Amino acid sequence: YILTKAFAYKVNAAKFPHADGEIKVAIIGSGPAGLGCSDVLNQLGFKVTVFERDDRPGGLLMYGVPNIKLPKEILLAKIKGLEEAGVQFCLNTNVGIDISWSAIREQYAAVVICTGSSQPRPLKLPGNELAGIHYAKDFLTSTTKGLLDHQLTPGTFLSAEGKDVLIIGGGDTGADCAALALSHGAHSILQAELQDCNMARISQEGFCELVKGDVSLQYNTKVKRLLGDDKGNVSGAELCRVEWGHTDSGMPVAKEIEETTLVLPVQMVLLALGFSGPEPVVFEKFGVKKTPLGTIANVSGSFLAAEPGVFAAGDARRGGGMVAWAFDEGWDAALECAKYLTAK
């Protein structure tokens, strides 16, 4: 909400650089961390190029947040301001695939990795091979891209119209999916969260989205398996209630409650289980190491991620979180990068 208002009133409007510098910096990823980082480095006089694998800049903000939460004209205005200030965006370019990491390192004095945490956690239960099961990111992206391309016609996007939709995961991404499915005209929407309401990660804004719509948000609910029809499409889900306790070592554990199992009709399943970290190409191609949590390892107390001149910021470094945190990471990483380049 705060970022939307800030964009609308140009609080974060890009400023023109203090000097026309010749030192080139590459930023990989144009999500909130990448945008924040590019803004600061550009203001400090560095020549900034942002590499983005998608057809539009913005990353998570462009395709991972529905228009009903962040109108894209606001985001596009922010990006236009950055371009006018001198930031260059290189789109449809997947670093490590379309352009090699070695080429990036040769051409740029420093690199800031802002790829985000975009590797979705997989579904691990019987029936996960059925058609009609989609990651939340793919569902959100298909509608947003269709709207922006003016191609939102039947068959061109993942539509929930007339379907019984099961959303697995009770966080903000799940709430976004619920709101979007509601706008599609879904027949029913159930959002199932294994944790109780005190453990689940959903903001007040996300909760209000569900309350305003005809969405059933069920905590302490376990999806046991998904059922399919004779054509291999998902047709139902078996669920049960759970109660939380602790193991002898104190770890929380969910125990199924007897006689609470039920089967519901389902024609679409959306997986909002969070993300496990950056995608494999980041670790395979960029020379960075992975933490036990799946994020990019960095020098303690620093944004430095690998060899000198390589930094990481945002969800790629700290794990999934709020958009505001990613912007903040991008700003701070830019300052550290600038300090490194100035000293060099």
Regions found by a protein language model. Name each.
Residues 1-28, 87-164, 270, 296-301:
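FAD-binding core/adjacent interface of flavoenzyme oxidoreductases
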Residues 23, 27-95, 121, 126-128, ...:
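Beta1-alpha1 glycine-rich phosphate/pyrophosphate-binding loop at the start
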Residues 91-105, 220-233, 245:
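A conserved short coil-to-beta-strand element within the FAD-binding core of flavoproteins
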Residues 109, 186-187, 308:
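A short helix->loop->beta-strand "cap" motif at the edges of active sites that frequently abuts
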Residues 115, 137, 169-170, 193-196, ...:
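Active-site proximal loops enriched in glycine and acidic residues that flank catalytic Cys/His/Asp
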Residues 129-162, 247-320:
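FAD-site-proximal beta/loop scaffold in flavoenzymes
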Residues 158-198, 253-268, 275, 294, ...:
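Long hydrophobic segments that form regular secondary structure
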Residues 177, 313-343:
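A conserved FAD-binding loop/helix module that cradles the flavin
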